[in-house]
A protein has these predicted regions:
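Bacterial N-terminal signal peptides that target proteins for export
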Residues: 1-10
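Bacterial N-terminal signal peptides
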Residues: 10-21
Length: 369
């Protein structure tokens, strides 16, 4: 058979096959209509740009966009939830420049001025402001009469009021601070306070008497004592330091060092003192108890930008609260803001009011009912 004839035969067979009637598509027994919203299109337009998928699987470029976005989202939320402990680390760092915990009592004997960088300070009252460390066991704090103060833990959780609105009712008294997990003996004769963290901050104010701060300051120096419970019979001497006019800072950073401050407190304090979701959020960006915080270059870039966006977001929340519940008056053009939306726990119907929490710790110091 000639070559031309062979080619014609082959072409004829191909044409015959193509012209044959196709069998009906097989009807599978388990065929199910997939509802809208479950099956993902192969291409999706989002604020991240175009996301591409094959049978629901993201391609490499899409995968990179999504994980970068996830890391950034988590970092911004981690920043907003980390404002409270970072503020406390900065507070403690500034006070430790004056002297060590447990033995140093800074006092603004002639009030505070602009040389000392603090959040929401008053310049018309003498403050006593100090830090306690419970790692070596229970501490006793003898509080003077006629003070108004509080004790907050390292997460800025309220622990107790002190003085006029505390259990001593302004008469002064002995407060026994117990460290996390303490199971030892608790003697009588104290206002017993259980803290969830090892580091704790106490601040109180005295008041002017006939325009004079000295009587209140003198009472603080006369009656204030801090000592381990084991040394109750022979308390060590305290170092009272006048810090009025002192140039020092107690406000936390808003850039990359924010994360280093946050890591410091996560490493120091018991995991039981924070909820697992918050700890999980911080762990997702590399801050986890017992592990080094050492982000690679891409993650460090994300964290640096997230800190800037987090700070900007906190400013927006604080300065331009967007719902009426944050104002004394219904008109949101009003500048009269409420300090505690959701009360001192920043909660409403059992849920954390996130903006109230973050906004408060951006601008303020001290939590008390």
């Amino acid at each position: 058979m000639k070559r031309k004839t062979v080619l014609l035969v082959i072409l004829g067979l191909i044409l015959a096959v193509l012209l044959m009637p196709m069998p009906a598509m097989a009807q599978y027994k388990m065929t199910t209509t997939v509802p809208l919203g479950i099956a993902l299109p192969d291409k999706v337009e989002t604020r991240l740009g175009t996301l591409k998928f094959f049978d629901g699987f993201p391609d490499n470029a899409t995968l990179e966009k999504l994980y970068d976005n996830l890391d950034f989202q988590r970092a911004v939320q981690a920043y907003l939830l980390g404002l409270a402990p970072v503020s406390q680390v900065a507070n403690r760092k500034g006070i430790r420049e004056v002297g060590p915990d447990n033995t140093t009592v800074p006092i603004f004997e002639t009030m505070m001025n602009a040389r000392s960088i603090f959040l929401t300070p008053n310049n018309n009252t003498p403050y006593t402001w100090f830090w306690l460390d419970l790692r070596k066991g229970p501490l006793v704090v003898e509080v003077p009469p006629k003070v108004l103060g509080l004790l907050d833990d390292m997460w800025y959780h309220f622990v107790t009021d002190i003085g006029m609105v505390g259990p001593d009712k302004g008469e002064g008294g002995k407060y026994l601070l117990l460290p996390p997990g303490y199971k030892g003996e608790v003697p009588k004769g104290y206002f017993v306070v259980q803290s969830a963290t090892y580091s704790n901050w106490i601040a109180w104010r005295t008041f002017l008497e006939n325009g004079d701060p000295k009587p209140g300051v003198d009472r603080v120096k006369k009656f204030t004592k801090i000592y381990p419970l084991s040394q109750a019979a022979n308390p060590p001497k305290l170092n009272f330091v006048n810090v009025s006019g002192r140039d020092f800072n107690t406000v936390g950073p808003a850039d990359y060092p924010f994360w280093e401050y946050l890591n410091q407190v996560v490493q120091e304090e018991p995991t039981e003192s924070v909820d697992p979701v918050t700890l999980g959020l911080w762990a997702s960006i590399g801050i986890q108890k017992g592990k080094p915080f050492n982000p690679d270059a891409p993650m460090k870039k994300i964290l640096t930008e997230a800190a800037l966006v987090g700070d900007a977001t906190a400013r927006a929340i604080m300065y331009r609260w967007r719902t009426p519940d944050g104002y004394y008056y219904p008109d949101t053009k009003s500048a009269w803001r409420l300090g505690f939306v959701g009360g001192y726990k920043f909660e409403e119907n059992g849920a954390r009011v996130l903006d109230a929490y973050s906004g408060f710790f951006f601008y303020a110091t001290g939590v008390t009912p």
